[in-house]
Structure formats: C-alpha cells, structure tokens
Amino acid sequence: MTAKTPLHTTHLACGAKMVDFHGWDMPLHYGSQLNEHHAVRNDAGMFDVSHMTIVDILGAGGRQFLRKLLTNDVDQITHNGKALYSCMCNEHGGIIDDLIVYQRASDNYRVVLNSATRQNDVAWIRAKSEGFAVGLQERRELSMLAVQGPNAIAKTLSILAPAHVDAVSTLTPFECVDVDHWFFARTGYTGEDGLEIIVPNEFVTQLWNDLLNAGVTPCGLGARDTLRLEAGMLLYGQDMDETTTPLESGLTWTVKWEPEDRGFIGMGALVSQKQQGIKRKMVGLTLLDKGIMRHGQKVIIEGCPDGIITSGSYSPTLQQSIALARVPVETGEQVLVDIRGKLIPAKVGKPRFIKQGKPV
C-alpha cells in the first residue's frame, strides 16, 4: 500500500501530479517543473519532505555512539544547535546512507535519513547502538517542509509567531533550534539558502497554507532533483550506495581520519583505500552538443574502462545538459557520452555546477 504524507489532500488541491516515490505518493510537480526550479533559484519554493525518516538518538552515550556510527566526527559540533553532514558506512566502507545529524542537546541528537532506506537504516542504527547508553525514537508523528531560495527565510519569518521569529532569525547555515515543539534548521538540498522545518503532523497543513499565502511556490520532486543536481548534491541509490565508498563519490571531505583511535565503522577499509589510491572518481559533465544525459549512460574515455553517468538531466539554470559521473581517475578534460547509440562530447569538470544561483 502506498504511503501518504499528512499533506496529501493539500497537494491534490494545489493541482499536483502525483507519482510513486519509494512507496510514497508524492508530488512530481504542480504544473511546471521548470517554473518551480526557477522559483527556488530566484525567489522561494517549498517541498513536502515528510517522507524522510526522522530518528532521535537520546541518552548520555549519544555522542560516543555517533562517533562510531558515522564517517564524519560529531566532536566537531562544539555546541548545541549545530548540524553536520556525514556518510554512514558498512564495515567495507560502502555507503549505507548519507544524512544530517543535529545536536539539540548533549544527550539529544536528531538524524534525518533518506526515505528509500528507512527500514535498513533504522535496523542498522538500532543494531549498532547495542552497548551504548542510548535509545532510539523514530518520529513518525512529525512532518517536514523544506523552504528554499534567496527569499525563503524572509518569507518564512513573515508568517511565524514572534517567538519563532526571534529564534530563527539568528540561525546561520547548518544551525538548528527548537521552539515550542517546532524544529528549524538552516539546511537544505537545493544549493540555495533556506530552512527545513519539522512540526507535529497536525500543524503542517496550516504552515503550508501560510507559506503559500506569503508567496512561496509549491515544488515537487522533479524540481528538487534538478536543483540538487545543479548544486552537485548526491542522490542515494543513484550516485552512491553500498557498492561505493565516500572516497570514490566525491565525499572524502566527510571522512575524518583523526584521531586514529576513533575507529568508526568502515574506517579500516577506507584507510586502506586511501593508501592504495582510488580507481574511480566522481566528476561533473557538461554536454557540448544537443542531447540529454541520463542515469546509466556509458561514458567513453580513450584508453580507459568506461565510466557511468549516475545522475543526468537538463539544467534549467545553465540551459544545457549536465550530469554527475563516476569515471576512472585517469580521465582527462573531455569524454564521449553514449546517448542512444550516438557518441556526444562532454566537458569534464568538478561535480558542482551552481553555487548560490550562479554558475561555478
């Protein structure tokens, strides 16, 4: 049976085209994916991301546990109200999921996980928590909205209660705050500034309608995908999975090697891979002729094994096709992409195309 978020009837009332997304009935768009994309780049858009998995890790052993569970080190969080992006790996260094962890208190951490990996992630975290002074609480009674774009925070502040305004207006990127059972984080998945807001299910429809009346554009999964691709943000299950490591996914920066005795899960395998050198790397591709790059297409590199496009689409901002691809480390500045049997040249660059709405 397909799952529905508390906003399901609201999406239908807004004219959403609904699609199945890993067992959830979610909006693909509300009439124009292109307009929704541009709204986020130039103004403000909102996404229902209540399908995401919210897990609170409670107890005195929370920090110690997360230092073992994650490749990034939560010891970098120096005070409550800070957030950290990380991979969660298996013993072989394969990526089980990528996530954001928020420190709400010294004994209270919140992690937001991908919906497609909900069962496996929760089971993994629960199994690995044995022996630590922690308890896990999956928060299915909460909904989550992402409000993104250069005007997202200003428009959100215009509809919030005074106590919320005071708390949210001082947030800097990758900070969070709790106010009256509402949780605000200055994080997102679009490459733009904005907020992710977690509220009890019974409040989310009013929040959505208030944002709509403030001029925030409803946006679906289609725009979310092109926005994150332009920003070089990876999609779990496409750009990385348990067969790939952070080092070959452009995520080495999320692995903290020191101190050596931290011994996070997968550390031995990743240290070995680092010492031996990776054979594949993540790059960005820009198509130099007509066509659209898509997931699964071959990347032809002279004198090397083929690479593979992990994510590809048309970029509404750049008005050309862009892609993320995993290729041999020897890959040079130009490759060929096999698009329906035609070999189309593409320029190789960094796996990021847009920063704060501007070409990189």
UniProtKB/Swiss-Prot annotation:
GO CC, any one term: cytosol
The record's listing under InterPro entries reads:
GCS_T, GCS_T_bac, GCST_C, GCV_T_N, GcvT/YgfZ/DmdA, GcvT/YgfZ_C, TrmE/GcvT_dom1
EC number(s) from the headed UniProt entry = 2.1.2.10
What top-level branch of life does the organism fall under?
Bacteria
**Catalytic reactions of this protein:** N(6)-[(R)-S(8)-aminomethyldihydrolipoyl]-L-lysyl-[protein] + (6S)-5,6,7,8-tetrahydrofolate = N(6)-[(R)-dihydrolipoyl]-L-lysyl-[protein] + (6R)-5,10-methylene-5,6,7,8-tetrahydrofolate + NH4(+)
Keywords on record: Aminotransferase, Transferase
Q: Which GO terms describe its molecular function?
A: aminomethyltransferase activity; transaminase activity
Q: Which Pfam families match?
A: GCV_T, GCV_T_C
Parts of the chain that traverse the membrane: none
Could you state one GO biological process linked to this protein? glycine decarboxylation via glycine cleavage system
NCBIfam families documented for this protein: gcvT, PRK00389.1
- Family to which the UniProt record says this protein belongs: Belongs to the GcvT family.
- Oligomer and partners: The glycine cleavage system is composed of four proteins: P, T, L and H.
Q: What does this protein do?
A: The glycine cleavage system catalyzes the degradation of glycine.
This chain's protein is named: Aminomethyltransferase
Organism, by scientific name, is Legionella pneumophila (strain Lens)
